[in-house]
Amino acid sequence: MESSPTSRYIIVAEKASVARAIKDALKSINGEFTVTNVSGHLLDLDLPDEYRNWWAVKPESIIRLRRLNHVIRDEESYQRLKRIFMENNGVLVIATDNDHEGELIGSEILSLYRSIRGEDAPFKRMRFNSTAKSELLESWGRLEDDLNWRWVEKARLRQAFDLITGAAFTRLLTLSTKRRNKNVNLISWGSCQIPTLYFVVKREKEIMSFKPTKYWYLRATLETAKGEKFTAYSQHLYEQKVAEELHSRAVNNNIATVKTFRTSLKTQYRPLPSRTDDVLRDLARLTRIAASKLLSMMETLYSEGYISYPRTDTNKYPQNFRFDAGLKATIEGGIVRERTERPPRPRQGKLDDGAHPPIFPVAPYMGSGILRKIWEYIAKRFYANAYCDDAEIAGQDAEIMIGDVELRARGSYVSSPGFYSVFDYFKPSENRLPQLTPGQSLRIVSVELVEDETKPPPRLSESELLREMEKNNIGTDATRASFPTLIAERGYVERKSGVYIPTMLGQTLIDSLELTDSRLVTPATRRTIEEVMNAIERGELKYSDALDNAAKIYEDLLIKCLGDIDNVAKKLSEAFQKSGDQRPKRRYRRYR
């Protein structure tokens, strides 16, 4: 977009650092630019004033609400923008993040702008995926004439739905329990946080109900003529007498014989381009830092110009993607020593959210600490995906006979490192067997009879919990990371040694609601709501119809819960009494 000397623009970004980057990028362009920013949402939804008194309003009337109030959420930004719009006559350019929430924030800015300048006041939409100067200049050259109103409506639906359902259920549970126990502060309910908690409780139940089964096996240490030692094992045996008999037949031998030896090669594919969910799962596993904090740090790297936009569900590069900038950042950031001569050949995924490319490095980050670790992961994954070969793993399988007793030895090693030479985070450990040949004799060093028992499944780590949430369509790539932290803040779970353990309160909440109706806690109900929201984005549903459809599903469940609330409240009150300092602090908003 060419700017004449008399062109005037008011550019509003979503973050101060992004505003600074835009201001710097546009220095070489003719025109008068007022560049400012908000700090997230300008406005928020709230219940009408007559619904403020928790004790005076029936919960079922809240979930039927369709007339909601817009309230100022960021007073400082609101007043600053209002003053700028009144004092400047430039054309508004909305430069918020290029996603659903960014679009909704853009509509809030536009609403304030047109309330001052008139309903026909002109505006433009600026879209970009990184704050690199070259991309911002390109973005300025292709300003759009309108917002994506389907994105706005989808984000608005999520906001309204979460408010009316969360407020209705939270008030019902809190007030009913408080009648029995005055010390109760808040029993928070949200259609995403409850299924997230359900996964943790479900796993805990599997662990607690697990009944171990004893088994036995033979473990033989063997040695080749060259002095190479390795271990072979029998299959698991569930009868002790059979195991003891097998051991007695094997232990009297001095020589074992190789029956078969096979080596097979398996391709280990290089990682797909980085999307939010994959990156957060890996980084949570590697750093043991909460995904919500990791995402916040990724946003810092983005807003300061080191990586592209970090909230994306895309794992395939567009055909016209320019790899040079990412490669340059990777080299200058010390990930690889010299520029490769081979052209980019990315392994492509199948997902494209239509808004952003995969996450990639934009500029070298030479700082230290967790920010450096995050940047390194993104840069290494970018290079491994686009410029490295797949790896190859050799699997070894040997059948060993000790008399008539058959044992098995398995080994593996990296036969061709490929991308592991750069992206080495999950490189498999090697357990290489010596090269064996059928008929080869081996010296038996020892044969032991080992007793063991089956183990319960492990508790969920944050990485595994995020995987469960994505698999069941709980939340989005932009919101999913917040829910594990949220249920911990509510006092429903504790995070110990990197895994989640439900508190008595959290387990009681899930158990009591599940007895009332399993749809209150299982992910299938929320998954249906996500489908309704996606229908808005596809243009198949209007906002009002979508909200009616979504709210009706939970209204029916609320009525069901009302019918059993005495039982639910009794159990929750007892859990509160026993849990003591696990009680969450009272919060009125952010029902999700």
Regions found by a protein language model. Name each.
Residues 1-159, 163-167, 445:
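Intrinsically disordered, low-complexity regulatory segments
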Residues 2-10, 112, 170, 290-292, ...:
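Basic, low-complexity terminal or inter-domain segments flanking catalytic cores
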Residues 7-8, 97-99, 183-186, 263-272, ...:
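Conserved short loop/turn motifs at secondary-structure junctions
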Residues 16-20, 35, 39, 71-82, ...:
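Amphipathic alpha-helical transducer elements in NTP-driven molecular machines
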Residues 20-52, 194-242, 386-432:
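Structured, non-catalytic alpha/beta "coupling" segments that mediate domain-domain communication
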Residues 73, 79, 87, 131-220, ...:
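C-terminal or mid-to-C-terminal helical accessory/interaction module adjacent to the motor/catalytic core
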Residues 240-273, 280:
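Metal- or metallocofactor-binding catalytic centers and their adjacent structured scaffolds
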